[in-house]
Amino acid sequence: MFRNYLNLPEILTQVYLNKYAILLILILIKLILLETSILDNLNSVLLDNSICDNGEIQPVLNTVHYMIVDSLQTLEAAGIVSIILTLKVIKQLALFFIELFFGTYICLLNAALKGSTEVALDASEGVIRAVNATVVSATNDIESALKGLSSIINDLVTGFNAIKNMFTGSKSDPTQYQNKINITLGDLKSKIMIPSEVLTKLDNFKNSSLYGLSQLGNGTQTIVSTPFELAIKKLNTMKSSYNFTTGAPSPINFREECLKDMSKLKDVQTDLAKLVEKISKWLFIGLVLAMVGSILYVSYIQWRHWRRMDKFISETGIDKEVQFRNQYNIYNNFLIYTIVKRMGIELNERTIWMLSFMFSKISRNVFFFGIMGVVSVVAQYILLNSVQSSMNNHIKSFDITSNSTSMSASTIYLRDMNTYIDDTQDKLNQELFSGIKEISVSLNSTIVEFLDKLNETLSDIFGSTPLAGPINTVVYCTIGRKLEKVEKGLTWMNDNLNINIPSISRDIEDGLSHMTFLQPQSVLARANKIIDLYRKSILLELYISLGLLGVWLFQIFVGSATLTIRYWNSTRQGNNSYAISSPHELSEQEKQVYGYPLSHPLIDGKDLTTSSSFYPTTEEKSK
């Protein structure tokens, strides 16, 4: 009878595929991959100079640097502006006090002297103009008479000349005497009249006689204000051309500072790599020894199980061991039992042996590990493919949204911040100086109104009397000039009393504009890279699962080779020798031919037909 079950040597050929060895192999593969990944990551992370090429850090460092420098520049500029304003205030106060005390006396003295000289000069000018008018009038009358006389004489001369020409036949110019008379009168007129240059000199003297006195006050103010003007001019020049960044340190260069530490990281990477390789080597040796131990353990378990089965067969008195083991193999293997017993499909003994070899307890572990791995890979691939497809759709939608956005976040921030600075400046000036400006405007209005009413009152009282001019002069010198200076001071204060908060500088704007912020599509792109990494790990799982299935399929080759060897051995033994076949029950004819075996009737009271250990004698047969 052909043996369809696996004997002990055939079982031991599969002990290297036990579940413990498979798990240890998977752990070993995991360890090897982890070691490779750690070494690669150490090289790529610790020794990768691209870490120092992070374009997101340098703009931040530049922005912080420019914010500090800009704050110092603002402080320096504010100091210069405050000094300029202080000098202007001191200058105006000094000029105001000069005007308050010294300007009054100069104004009154100027008015008094100017009034006296103008009276004298006006009188002289009146006399000269009267004399000239009289002389001109007289000379004009004389000139008219002379013109009449000249006409008569010219007529007589013309007549005489005509008579003379009748006798002499010559001609003469009739206007020669007339020209002589006219010229003589013109010279006489110019000699008698007072020259006009005298009046011009009087006017110039009147206008310039008090020039030095009027310049005395202006010179005093100029002497006082000149140092202030020079200082203010220098400060304005400094403010417009001063290089605030002189001496300021350069921004931190992230790449240079990062590369300085790369040599230290290289030493760290070398030490870590040696540590990983050393520990991995010992773990690898331990796992290999554990696999060898699992093979020995499973071999012992299979040998013990086979020995117990032999003991069971011998103790129960089973004389048909091959037949018993064949039946036991069919019932013990779930696949063969399902095909033969449940489905009723007849299989020959060699097919049953091959199925037993392919789906033994050891071999089917490899098969199920491989199948479950492939199923897991398919499920993970479906999940990752769905997630990646959805993520790509989201990336496209974000790209469309970002393209439709006209301004970046930094541009919006700069615009809003400048608007906030302007609003804060207006609000601060409004809260701090609005009351003062209202008071200054009110005082200016009051001063203007007071001066208008004062002039109207003086005009009503003195009108066009001779006292109107001196009174107006005295009032202007004592009151009007002071009020005008106060009015100018209030106007200057109203124009300059404000706080100017500087806007964000161009350097800070450039730094913020170069900063890259977190974008949804960039995050999704990174997640997409992670999915690609998972895809690679899934492919590795697929390779491992296919490798397990390949090992299981390799059992077909081993089983076929084993069957071939068994067939070759059985053929060779059949041709060379004969062997006693397995015992089986005799048929009725065989019992008659060989004699029916009987058991001894006195042994255990067994039925006489159930034992072949006692044969009857001839005498018993004859009976």
Curated annotation (Swiss-Prot):
Localization in the cell:
Cell membrane
Positions on the Extracellular side per record topology? 1-19, 114-281, 387-537
Where are the membrane-spanning stretches?
A: 20-40, 93-113, 282-302, 366-386, 538-558
Q: Which UniProt keywords apply?
A: Cell membrane, Conjugation, Glycoprotein, Membrane, Transmembrane, Transmembrane helix
Instruction: Note whether Protease occurs among the keywords.
Output: no
Query: Carbohydrate attachment sites?
Result: 132, 182, 207, 218, 243, 403, 444, 455
Please give the family membership noted in the entry: Belongs to the PRM1 family.
Q: What does this protein do?
A: Involved in cell fusion during mating by stabilizing the plasma membrane fusion event.
Protein name as annotated: Plasma membrane fusion protein PRM1
Please name the source species: Candida albicans (strain SC5314 / ATCC MYA-2876) (Yeast)
